[in-house]
Every structure is written in C-alpha cells, then in structure tokens.
C-alpha cells in the first residue's frame, strides 16, 4: 500500500490538497518551482499566493460561492481557515490580507512533519505512484507540453487580468465616502462618485487608451468574470454602469443622492494602507493606467502600488480527460486539480484541490475514491467539468445553475438559493457520515 503522494504546485489547489493528504497521515512531497523559477504573475515564494484580487467573493449562503466556502469549512479546509483568520472588511464578501493569507498557508504546511517541500521544477508527469498535478493556469512551458501530450488534445486557454492597487494615503478623502452597497454588512468600501460628465470623459479616455502587447490576445478569449475594464467599455458606453461602476445602493451621504456612476475601492491588506480598484482588471500600458485612472474622482493624486496586468491562463479539456473524482481516465493514481481543470476562481480552485487531496489519500490507503453528491457545490463543479460538452467547454465558477433544482417551488430567488444551500449542506453531512470523512 502506497502511503506517499506527490503534489506538484503550491498554489491554492496544491496547498489544499497537501493539507488534506497530510491530515490523513500521508507522506507528501510538495513541489513548487518558485522562487527558483517564477511565473509572469507571481511576486513571492509563498504558497497560495493571490495573483489577482484579494476577494474570495460572497460569504452569504444565498450565493453559490458562499455555499462552496461553507462546504469546505465543513471538511476542514486549510484555505478557508487561513482566509477566515486573515479576513479584512468587505461587507457581505470575504476578502483577505493577501500577504498574511499566503504566509499562514505557507507556515502551516511547512510546519507539518509529513509535508516535504521541494523548491524545484517538475518537467515530466510521473508515471508511477500517486500524483496530483495542481500547477495552475501558469504551468511552465515544459510541463505544459507534457500535459498536452498526455491529454491528447490541444490545451485551451483564456486571458486573465489583475486590477491596480493604490496607496490609501493618496486617496482624496474629501471626495470619496465609505459605504457598502445597500448598507449590507459593515461600510467596507471607499466609493468614488462620478457625475455624468465625469463618467463620459473617463469613458472616452478609457476606450482610447493604449494597451500593452500580449502575444495571442483577442477580446473573445477573455474570461467573462475577470474581463479587462477597457474590453468591457468597448462593448458599449453604458456596459460599465451595469457592472463595476453600477451606482445603485451607493447613495452619496454628502448629497443624499445616487451618483451617475461609482468606482469602488476595496481594502487590500489588514493595515488598510492599500486599496484595489474593484472590477478594474486591465491590460492598459502602465503610463495609460496612471493617466486614465487618475481621472476617477478621489484618485487624482493616486499613488499606484501595483499596476494592473494580464496573463495567459491554460486549462485542460477535462470532459475528455478526467473523472469526477479528479482522477485521470487513462492513468490510475494521477489526479489534476485547480484552475487548470476548468474550475474558475480562488475558492473553486481550492475546492477542487480539497476533493483531489481526499481522493488521492484514499487511493494511497487502499480505499475507494469518492464522487461527491451532485447536490453539493463541490460535487456539482466536479460533475460539470467532467460531463459537459468538450467542444464548448469553458472555465466555470460555482453556480446554482450547476445544482439540481428543488422538488418544490420557492418564488423568491434568494430564499430559493438558501433552500438549495441548506439541502447541499444536509447532503454533505450525510455523505461525510457515510464515508467517514473527518
């Protein structure tokens, strides 16, 4: 019986998988090529580095990703523990201090006696033993080529982007105001109000701004959930008003009126010295970011701590390659996890690592691998990425659309979602008990 598992990749999925393996007594060899070899998006050597936003989205049980988080908490997720421990104010959402978050994950794993960390690049898929490949959408070229060959299909890709971060001390507090939309949760966001004239001047400059060159980039290959603000703007002058610049529920306390448009800033670290511009993922040249984003009221003298940037993300054709336990169909003992499987988002990525980690541990212990109930967020994601049409396969966030409908009617959408979440948690509890999952 093999009681050793190799995990390749120390991102969110690989870190969660390593934790799930280690807590079940498995000896884990965790390989991470950083800092010896870096990627276009990473900036540190820490595990579970957040390269895009610091938000893990909704924390509400009436939201699919909120349900996913709760399921993961029920299964003793390291990523959720670290996120809850390093949370910063974000209204009804869960946002974290990104540096503290990755530091907690890194220290936890490195302190475990049965997790052996190797700072080196893996260039081939191991043929023997049990392995989890969780190298993420920025997998090194050499290993990516091996994975492509193993899958027997062309790898798919999309382009992802990160939003700029500004120094809190450079924000004009005479203009911005603190408020969460509809006053949900604590007043966690700084809001930059725009008049109609200010909005259209900003819009005109944004669509005319110069973008950086990126090989192979096309607007159609942008993931909808992380679309660059300039791409969104080019879809129509009012598109942003129904997206990140939506003003509803954000009345300006100085005037008592709703602005024409509002740009929100979200706290990026626990010390509240940095804020990111919500929804402003971008591929503009750095000079253009400074010029155009300084037109936002309150950011006229903004100091940019980090400019937005874009990178290419690669993922595999999971419907042709994986079973819903995240194990490869043509090689027993080889699992894939994380964004490269086609789940999209920090929490979703970690969730896939959780399931892959549990299953790799069970295989190492000579137990049957598990297929989580389709009525749970974890099970519905695994089911989607392995059964959907390969021809039209695209990355997917957690969604109620993936979960079975209720067998009774609930008219109110929020209440209906809550009922689906309650059913999911009940089914997960029964599944845990039946399969003796701790």
Curated annotation (Swiss-Prot):
Physiological role: Catalyzes the folate-dependent formation of 5-methyl-uridine at position 54 (M-5-U54) in all tRNAs.
NCBIfam families: gid_trmFO, PRK05335.1
Cofactor dependency: FAD
Any one GO cellular component localisation term in the record: cytosol
GO molecular function: flavin adenine dinucleotide binding; tRNA (uracil(54)-C5)-methyltransferase activity, 5,10-methylenetetrahydrofolate-dependent
PANTHER family recorded: GLUCOSE INHIBITED DIVISION PROTEIN A (PTHR11806), METHYLENETETRAHYDROFOLATE--TRNA-(URACIL-5-)-METHYLTRANSFERASE TRMFO (PTHR11806:SF2)
Secretion signal span: none
Keywords attached to this entry: Cytoplasm, FAD, Flavoprotein, Methyltransferase, NAD, NADP, Transferase, tRNA processing
SUPFAM superfamilies in the cross-refs: FAD/NAD(P)-binding domain
Catalysis performed (reactions): uridine(54) in tRNA + (6R)-5,10-methylene-5,6,7,8-tetrahydrofolate + NADH + H(+) = 5-methyluridine(54) in tRNA + (6S)-5,6,7,8-tetrahydrofolate + NAD(+); uridine(54) in tRNA + (6R)-5,10-methylene-5,6,7,8-tetrahydrofolate + NADPH + H(+) = 5-methyluridine(54) in tRNA + (6S)-5,6,7,8-tetrahydrofolate + NADP(+)
Name of the protein described by the UniProt record: Methylenetetrahydrofolate--tRNA-(uracil-5-)-methyltransferase TrmFO
Residues noted as binding FAD in the record, renumbered to the chain: 9-14
InterPro entries xrefs: FAD/NAD-bd_sf (IPR036188), MnmG-rel (IPR002218), MnmG-rel_CS (IPR020595), MnmG_N (IPR040131), TrmFO (IPR004417)
Organism: Lactobacillus johnsonii (strain CNCM I-12250 / La1 / NCC 533)
Highest classification ranks of the organism: Bacteria, Bacillati, Bacillota, Bacilli, Lactobacillales
Family designation: Belongs to the MnmG family. TrmFO subfamily.
HAMAP family reported in the protein's UniProt record: TrmFO
EC number, UniProt record: 2.1.1.74
GO biological process terms held by the UniProt record: tRNA methylation; tRNA wobble uridine modification
Location within or outside the cell: Cytoplasm
Chief localisation class: cytoplasm
Pfam families: GIDA (PF01134)
């Amino acid at each position: 019986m093999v009681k050793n598992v190799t995990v390749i990749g120390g991102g969110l999925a690989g870190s969660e998988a390593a934790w799930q393996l280690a807590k079940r007594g498995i000896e884990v060899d965790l390989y991470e090529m950083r800092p010896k070899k870096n990627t276009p998006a990473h900036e540190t050597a820490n595990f579970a580095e957040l390269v895009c936003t610091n938000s893990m989205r909704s924390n509400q049980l009436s939201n699919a990703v909120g349900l996913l988080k709760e399921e993961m908490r029920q299964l003793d997720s390291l990523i959720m523990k670290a996120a809850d421990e390093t949370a910063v104010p974000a209204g009804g959402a869960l946002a974290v201090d990104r540096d503290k978050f990755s530091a907690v994950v890194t220290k936890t794993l490195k302190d475990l006696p049965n997790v052996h960390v190797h700072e080196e690049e893996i260039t081939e898929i191991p043929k023997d033993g049990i392995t989890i490949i969780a190298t993420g959408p920025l997998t090194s070229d050499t290993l990516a080529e091996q994975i492509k060959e193993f899958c027997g299909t062309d790898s798919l890709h999309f382009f992802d982007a990160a939003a700029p971060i500004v120094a809190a001390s450079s924000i004009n507090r005479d203009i911005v105001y603190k408020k969460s939309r509809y006053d949900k949760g604590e007043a966690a966001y700084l809001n930059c109000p725009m008049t109609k004239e200010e909005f259209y001047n900003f819009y005109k400059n944004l669509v005319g701004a110069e973008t950086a060159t990126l090989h192979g980039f096309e607007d159609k290959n942008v993931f909808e959930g992380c679309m660059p603000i300039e791409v969104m703007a080019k879809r129509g002058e009012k598109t942003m008003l129904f997206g990140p610049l939506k003003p509803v529920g954000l009345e300006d306390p100085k005037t008592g009126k709703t602005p024409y448009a509002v740009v929100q800033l979200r706290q990026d670290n626990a010390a509240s010295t940095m804020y990111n511009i919500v929804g402003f993922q971008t591929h503009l040249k750095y000079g253009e970011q400074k010029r155009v984003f300084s037109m936002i009221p309150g950011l006229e003298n903004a100091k940019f701590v980090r400019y937005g940037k874009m990178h290419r993300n690669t993922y595999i054709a999971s419907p042709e390659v994986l079973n819903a336990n995240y194990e490869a169909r043509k090689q027993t003992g080889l699992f894939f996890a994380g964004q490269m499987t086609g789940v999209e988002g920090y929490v979703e990525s970690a969730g896939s690592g959780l399931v892959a980690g549990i299953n790799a541990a069970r295989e190492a212990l000579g137990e049957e691998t598990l297929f989580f109930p389709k009525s749970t967020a974890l099970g519905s994601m695994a089911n989607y990425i392995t059964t959907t049409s390969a021809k039209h396969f695209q990355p997917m966030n957690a969604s109620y659309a993936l979960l079975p409908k209720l067998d009774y009617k609930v008219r109110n959408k929020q209440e209906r979602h809550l009922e689906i979440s309650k059913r999911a948690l009940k089914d997960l509890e029964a599944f845990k008990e039946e399969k003796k999952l701790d």
